[in-house]
Structure formats: structure tokens, C-alpha cells
């Protein structure tokens, strides 16, 4: 299973701002119903783009400094940080397909390995 990292006020810069690859950040809280709907979408993103995009979650209640720094007024807020570009964000639940379209993630998609069928494998 692909790894979803958890950022704090102290490690956010390292995990997100200094990351060498793009990062999708889920700003959430345990009491937030729509945030619970976003969690499976983040898992799908992590699996689909493993090795190409990092997924990071930020608990806004435990990390108020990040909430202030990024002006998070509503949750869930999902932000896309691409090295060398301004972050983009959306508020509220979005299914995987909408997140991919909103943030232009198709360019980062990792090709699935092609498995050979038993008929196409020849023995020497």
C-alpha cells in the first residue's frame, strides 16, 4: 500500500515545501464529516501515483500554525504543491477524477507494468 505521510507544524517544510516531486496535501480534522469522505480518495491517489506524487495529511486542529500560514478557513481543503509553481487548492470533497482534472495530475501518472500472459512466454 502506498504511504500517506502526516505533516506537522515542524516537518511541513521538509515534507512539502522542499519536496522534489509534487505533493497533494489534505488539510482535515477528525470531527469533519466531509474529511472522512476525502480519506479514501487520498488513498486512491497515493496508490495510483505512488513514486510520482506524495500525499500528505495535515490535522488542522493539531497544527494551527499551518492552518494560519495557508489561510485554511474551511475543511477539507486539498492543495497541490508542485515544485516551482504556486500551490493550487480546492475546498470540499472531490472524487479522484475531479482532483486529477483540477490539478492536472495526468502528466504524473505512473504506467502500470504490463504482465505477459502465459501463452506469450516461450521456454528455451
Question: At which residue positions do the language-model features occur?
Answer:
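A short beta-strand-turn-helix
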Residues: 4-23
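Conserved Rossmann-like nucleotide-binding pocket used by diverse enzymes
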Residues: 8, 28, 54-56
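Short pre-active-site segment immediately N-terminal to redox-active cysteine/selenocysteine motifs
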Residues: 20-21, 28-31, 74
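Hydrophobic beta-strand anchors of alpha/beta hydrolase catalytic cores
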Residues: 24-25, 55, 78
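Typically the conserved alpha-helix immediately C-terminal to a functionally engaged Cys/Sec
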Residues: 34-49
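Structural microenvironment flanking redox-active thiols in thiol-disulfide oxidoreductases
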Residues: 58-66
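Non-catalytic, surface beta->alpha helical segment in thiol-disulfide oxidoreductase systems
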Residues: 74, 79-114
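Short acidic DE-rich linear segments
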Residues: 113-124
Amino acid at each position: 500500500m502506498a504511504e500517506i505521510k502526516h505533516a506537522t507544524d515542524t516537518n511541513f517544510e521538509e515534507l512539502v515545501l522542499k519536496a522534489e516531486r509534487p505533493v497533494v496535501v489534505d488539510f482535515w480534522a477528525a470531527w469533519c464529516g466531509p474529511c472522512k469522505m476525502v480519506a479514501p480518495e487520498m488513498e486512491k491517489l497515493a496508490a495510483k501515483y505512488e513514486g510520482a506524487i506524495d500525499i500528505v495529511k495535515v490535522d488542522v486542529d493539531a497544527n494551527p500554525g499551518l492552518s494560519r500560514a495557508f489561510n485554511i478557513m474551511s475543511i477539507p481543503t486539498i492543495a497541490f504543491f508542485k515544485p516551482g509553481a504556486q500551490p493550487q487548492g480546492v475546498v470540499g470533497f472531490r472524487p479522484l477524477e475531479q482532483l486529477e482534472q483540477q490539478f492536472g495530475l495526468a502528466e504524473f501518472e505512473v504506467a502500470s507494468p504490463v504482465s505477459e500472459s502465459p501463452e506469450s512466454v516461450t521456454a528455451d
